[in-house]
Amino acid sequence: MNRYFIDIHTHILPRLDDGSQDEEVSIQMAQIAAGTGTKCLVCTKHTDMTEPVSREDGRLIEEGVLWLRDELQRERIPLEVLPGMEIMASEDIRSKIREGLLFGINHSRYFLVEFPFDAPVDYITFVLDEMRSLNGVVPVIAHPERYYCVQEMPEQIYYWVMDGCLTQCNRASFEGKFGNREEVTALRLLDANLVTCIASDAHSSHRRTPRLESGFRQLSSRYGEWAANLLLREHPERMIRNELLEVRGFARHVSQYPME
């Protein structure tokens, strides 16, 4: 089987958020992704819920994806790109989803949601519960290893996962690119089988890039190729296809939480 990766978290669309700031950088990011084994990536624009959200946000993402697809075809870059959002959590997230202002990864049941780094456990739990109360919505917690409450109490992830949430860690976190606390937390979550997938959270072509092959090597060395394939291809592929992903089965053999 040819090795390839699915990246569900990137900021590759130009000038829509703090990611790529021009078309040239977007093309460079696509070249890096395709050249290092990524077959498909999701264009997850930041959607800041502290600002008014409208259907214009979704339209800009869809138009950006269409533009990027045309450019990739013109440049002969073998990369599939799909629409998505990285949604900043808010107390009214449930109503915004119901109104159709927010959508999941490739319009699937899987909604990528992020929180302020200093968000307390109770607030995160409330937002996740609000999302899960909607039939067919599965929260995917973006980079939980970067949240202070998870760094201080990583066992909390176990309860969110067992409630039906998924988790996406950043490749750069367990490589130490964000700092020691993020690295230690990411590795503890990985060791406990509480990470659903790994993504790049790419923002540029030179610093936070869409390279996933180094993550594959490190995961393979630490856990075996089967685990690397699960986190970088199989689980993300189920998300973009809107297929069922049984998270309780993923953590089923953790009989006692190993982080104490």
Regions from the PLM with identified roles:
Residues 1-77:
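An N-terminally biased module of ancient metal coordination in phosphate/nucleic-acid-related enzymes
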Residues 34, 132, 190-191:
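Non-catalytic positions within long, well-ordered alpha-helices that form the structural scaffold/packing
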Residues 6-8, 42-44, 82-85, 140-142, ...:
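Active-site neighborhood of phospho(di)ester-bond hydrolases with catalytic His/Asp-centered motifs
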Residues 212-260:
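Mid-to-C-terminal alpha-helical segments outside catalytic/metal-binding sites
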Residues 48-51, 88-90, 146-150, 174-177, ...:
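Active-site environment of divalent metal-dependent phosphoester hydrolases
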Residues 46, 194-210:
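Short acidic/histidine-rich active-site segments
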Residues 52-168, 246, 250-260:
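Extended substrate/RNA-proximal surfaces in nucleic-acid metabolism proteins
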